[in-house]
Amino acid sequence: MSRYDDFTEVERAILRIVQSNLPDSLTPYADIAREVGTDEETVLALLRSLKEEGPIRRFGASIKHQRAGWNHNAMVAWKVDPAIVEEAGTKAAEHPHISHVYYRPSSAPDWPYELYTMIHGRHATAHMDVIEQLRRETPLEEFAVLESLRELKKTSMTYF
């Protein structure tokens, strides 16, 4: 059993609030503290410890990329030699137009692609520039492009 199995009710209440939208104010942490019946330092200490220990990877604003002009997306599936997955995946993850990189081994005979990158662009063919760059900078060659036609659901996971 880990520390995370034993959150107090106050900690759970804090986490329920911060996993959605922070209060729109100059003192969001004090506002959260007031709402859950604790002090601001308790809120900050919890968030700081979870960030340091790893369950909170990052804490920041979520941008609605379509409204910011990044409305063309493509999932690019790459055929990758398992020996270079780390190298190729790390290089792809460094690219500013790639938001997600996953390695998913496949046993399907007609689907040899195992490394997946989500590429975002401002125009319909922007992903091709990123693909060509990755092909120049890594041993990746064979790929399949799965373009996003429509977003059917996009929500952040809620845990508490």
Curated annotation (Swiss-Prot):
Pathway: Porphyrin-containing compound metabolism; protoheme biosynthesis
EC number: 4.1.1.111
Tree of life domain: Bacteria
Molecular function via GO: lyase activity
Keywords: Heme biosynthesis, Lyase
Reaction equations catalysed: siroheme + 2 H(+) = 12,18-didecarboxysiroheme + 2 CO2
Coiled coil: none
SMART domains attached to this UniProt entry: HTH_ASNC (SM00344)
GO BP terms in the entry: heme biosynthetic process
Pfam families: AsnC_trans_reg2, NirdL-like_HTH
Entries under InterPro entries matching the protein: AhbB-like, AsnC_trans_reg2, HTH-Siroheme_Decarb, NirdL-like_HTH, Tscrpt_reg_AsnC-like, WH_DNA-bd_sf
NCBIfam families: Siroheme_Dcarb_AhbB (NF040707)
Extra remark beyond the main annotation: Binds heme b, but reducing agents do not affect the activity of the enzyme.
Known function: Involved in siroheme-dependent heme b biosynthesis. Catalyzes the decarboxylation of siroheme into didecarboxysiroheme.
Description of how the protein assembles with itself and partners: Forms a heterodimer composed of AhbA and AhbB. Also forms heterotetramers.
Family listed: Belongs to the Ahb/Nir family.
Record protein name field: Siroheme decarboxylase beta subunit
Gene (name only): ahbB
